[in-house]
Amino acid sequence: ADRTGRNFVAPREAKMMENISARLQHMDETGVDVQVLHPTLFIRQVADRPEADVAVCRSYNRWLADIWKQSDNRLRWVAMPPVLDMKAAVQELEFAVEHGACAVGMRPIEGDRTLPDPYFHPLYDAANELGVAVAVHIGNSNPYVERLLGGGLGGSAFPALRLMCAAAAHALILSEIPGKFPNIRWAFLESASMWVPAVVHDLRRRIRASKGKD
């Protein structure tokens, strides 16, 4: 507020989406036309059974669809796919786009899979056809990896959650995904950008080496 002259601290009922009118009023007061809602709940694994994953994601997506309906298209949102059931994940994305979603959310690691895994191709194909972004939020859906990196380094979320975005971006750029699904826009959220130069430097080195250059 000191630098912008605007107070972005919203009342609880607006922040927690308990009162949509209050949220819209706060947006008006701060000069914000549109917001994109992204959850914190899903930065970690929410279920280890497909049917539970579907139930949690479907409930969340229906809630956000109702919020969007009340907002006159001002509260867009990120759909959460139940990635343990890829058929259901595609169905959820299709529903979400029809009800105000502008992106599909993913974690840098999904269980025992990384994002270039062909398992996710049906979801990427749907995002490519629907024209929505893939929003990779800091997170980790592999409990073992999260415990190993977080607990082993003093409990820090930096290696366990944030650095995973750098690894995901690096892997995606080296994969066939950008060429296979050219309409997808990728976003890496809440991971800052200090890792970008390191990723770009390493990619340049690898690409030069693959072409036989020093």
Task: Please tell me what each predicted stretch does.
Residues 1-214:
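Helix-coil boundary/capping segments in enzymes
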